[in-house]
Structures are given as C-alpha cells and as structure tokens.
A protein has these predicted regions:
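Venus flytrap/periplasmic-binding-protein-like
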Residues: 1-30
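Structural signal for conserved beta-strand scaffold positions within catalytic alpha/beta enzyme cores
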Residues: 14, 34-35, 98
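Hinge/cleft segment of the Venus flytrap/periplasmic-binding protein
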Residues: 48-124
Length: 124
C-alpha cells in the first residue's frame, strides 16, 4: 500500500546540467541537477594519459601531483571490468546546482552564460 496521496511534492532531479535541465530549474519544474565540468574531465583524462605514457604509477598521488583546482577522488573499489577485476577510477566530485546557485555554480566560472530572462546557455 502506498502513502502517496496525490498532493505530495515530487522532487525531480537530473544529471549533467544540460540546457534543458537548467531551463526546467529556472521554470521551477525541476529541483536540482548535478554538474561535472567537461573541461575538468578532459584535464583528468589528459593527465592520466600523460602519466601512463611516462610509465608512472597510476594511483591517488596523481591528484596531488597534477595540482587540479577541482575536487577529484581516487576510487579502487566501486567499479569492476566485465571479467570481475577492480577498475581504479578518478571521480570528479559533482556540483549540486539549484535555482539558488545557478549564477555561482555555472555562470561565474564561465561554463554558461545567462540571458536576460534568466535562462542559461553553454558558453562555448
């Protein structure tokens, strides 16, 4: 038996902070989204590839050596390959984006621009 009475508030969330999700947040149709900057994902990928090509040991120390200015965690337990081997991963910490922090989280860093109506558009 459900306790849903039809008048409960349903939270709608999203991932990736794409333009449609952000418009829904501005319009009050969606509560939040999580965002990871593609540029930061590219930086991690490039630094990881450079370290591998140099023959460096790939571990958590890459985070400190690289001097990234964003949060990243090294995870050796959560993911496995199809044959069951652990797959160490560098995971960017996502930013929770709501109507209250659109400007601070996405516009101020230069990821998005905001038009006169308050809607966000990719900066590049």
């Amino acid at each position: 038996e459900s306790d849903y009475a039809g008048d409960n508030t349903v939270l709608i969330t999203g991932q990736d902070g794409d333009e449609a999700n952000l418009a829904n947040i501005v319009d009050g149709k969606q509560s939040m989204t999580v965002y990871k900057a593609v540029a930061n994902e590219a930086v991690v990928t490039l630094d990881l590839a450079k370290a591998m090509l140099a023959g460096d040991t790939i571990d958590e120390s890459l985070i400190e050596k690289s001097g990234w200015d964003f949060e990243c965690a090294y995870d050796t337990e959560s993911y496995e390959t199809s044959d069951g081997n652990k797959c160490p991963s560098f995971l960017l910490v996502p930013t929770v984006v709501t109507k209250d922090n659109l400007q601070e989280a996405l516009v101020d860093p230069g990821y998005y621009t905001m038009d006169d109506d308050g809607y966000l558009h990719p900066a590049n």
